[in-house]
Amino acid sequence: MKRPLILLVLILLSLAIWTYQNQAAEENIGIVIADKHKGVCWVGSRNPLEGWELDTLGSFGVSHISQTPFGWQGDPNLPEIKWEEHSDKMWWGESLKGMNTTTSIGREKGIESILKPHLWVRGSWPGTISMETEANWEKWFEQYTAFILYFARFAEKNQTPIVCIGTELEMTSEREENWRKVIQEIRSVYKGELVYAANFTEYQQIEFWDALDYIGIQAYFPLSDKTNPDLDELISSWEKKSKEIEKTVRQYRKPVIFTEIGYCNTEDAAIQPWVWPNERKEIPLSEEVQALCYEAFFQTAWKKDWLAGVYFWKWYPQPRERDPDFTPQNKKAQLVMRSYFSE
């Protein structure tokens, strides 16, 4: 009788060890981030900076800014990407000279920059870009590669630590092999780290995360279906979103950067956070809801080991008195951001 009993004990012990190890693996994904990016999305200025414009960022605990040069596409269904290399019509802060100067000023103040080029699509948004023929797809990727390599070379020369290879190009990211070629081309001229900024509806479908250093998410997740939600509801929503994100993190073993996150100062900010301010003009203003959305994020996703950083949309060189708006500047959300960024 002793032998079967001993065997049973060994089986139960092995099962307990196996269960413990699996639970530990579930709790610890194995990603260790030394210092999270405490970032904001910097708005390129029309005119040259004087230097003081970045002073307040340090006092709010900001460690990084993302700078955004633009390319333009007139029709989302035609391969016609254009960008300005030198033009008097360009805003200074979006030019190579302006971004270089902004980076230098920031570094003097302990603030690093990442580069995040965007495509501006006339009458639409980048997520609708889709070619109707295979020939046009090849032309589009050829043009896009030239566009992103132009800025990757600038980033290499400027010692920019991270380049975002694309932003919200949802219909194009289905073409995995094309994107792998783009990534390969970028790595041939740029030695820093790479991220792709996937729309929150897109990141789970992307299959080339393994070729990048970070999983990037434009984190405009809907958090509520009503105006003026309370903090408990927002926290619950973020906990659910975090569990979904963790599935992708476990699959690819890559840290996440929220390449954008933001909320307007309106009562409906948590319903569809991505909606532009000019579509919210009839909605009552609410600094409280905006601040609660910030608080819910910081109490949940911000604490995750897999989150390498966040960039809040958006921050003006000179504060603007325009409501509604995404910026936390001079609002209650700014105080929430500072309290966590300063920890």
Put a short name on every predicted segment:
Residues 39-44, 80-96, 133-143, 166-173, ...:
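The substrate-binding groove and active-site-proximal loops of carbohydrate-active enzymes
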Residues 219-232, 248-289, 313-324:
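Active-site clefts of carbohydrate-active enzymes
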Residues 44-58, 141-154, 199-208, 291-300:
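Short, acidic/polar
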Residues 24-59, 68:
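Boundary/entry segment of secreted carbohydrate-active catalytic domains
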Residues 28-31, 84, 275-279, 291-296, ...:
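Aromatic-rich peripheral "rim/lid" segments of glycoside hydrolase catalytic domains that contact
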Residues 53-55, 71-124, 164, 175-195, ...:
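Aromatic-lined substrate-binding rim segments of carbohydrate-active enzymes
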Residues 63-79, 94-172, 268, 315-318:
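Substrate-binding cleft and catalytic face of glycoside hydrolase catalytic domains
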Residues 148-167, 198-236, 255, 259, ...:
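Aromatic- and acid-rich polysaccharide-binding/catalytic face
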